[in-house]
Amino acid sequence: MVGEVRIDHTDEDVANAIKGFLADENPVDAIFATTNLLTICGLKYINSLGLKIPDQLAVVGFDETDAFDLFYAPVTYVKQPMAELGLKSVRILLDAIEKKGSSIESAIFETELVVRKSSVVTL
């Protein structure tokens, strides 16, 4: 399932998306948020429901933030190679400036899943 969240209504849209995921005939058992803001909004809403992470709902975020360490179940996240992303972006920008034009370029970077308590159910 995919939920749409508008940046100007983040808390409300995240809450509505999670409500829908949980009310579905086949409710989700995990949520993957694509930004730190969405992850944090999701954690706030899940807490307001009294759900226990990860026992009742697992949470995975995208990208690292110290805020994930403050939660009672530190958040699992996808770690991006930020230094490599920055260097590649600068190279593309400098090439565009030197060549007085722009081109579309794609790049693939290795990521790492950092597994923490928010996605690991202990028996």
Show which residues each predicted segment covers.
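Bacterial carbohydrate/catabolite-sensing allosteric modules
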Residues: 1-123
